[in-house]
Amino acid sequence: MKKAIIITSRVHPGEIPASFALEGMVDFLLSDAKEAKVLREQYIFYIVPMINIDGVVHGNQRTNLAGLDLNRVWSNPSYLLSPVVYAIKNLASMICKERKIDVFCDIHAHF
């Protein structure tokens, strides 16, 4: 059975280069490269390209619209104040019921 890899990005809205880094990763994973083919044979990839969409749209640098740094609420996310983190944790729990998660990668990048 294939294992899982979860990749997330843009938990901090101001980390624009993280989107480009993730785009490069996805381009590679979809390529004909031998290594990419091996990874696709061994893993299922779950990719969340932009965790903090509202923060990005509103020009925030680090927080969501509730003023929360989403990187600090993973242990106990609020359904109302940090719904995306809440949903990603639920997704990870559902994945764990079916397969092993080998990697959870949260991409950060600055200029």
Where are these regions (language model features)?
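Active-site/substrate-binding loop(s) of hydrolase catalytic cores
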Residues: M1-F111
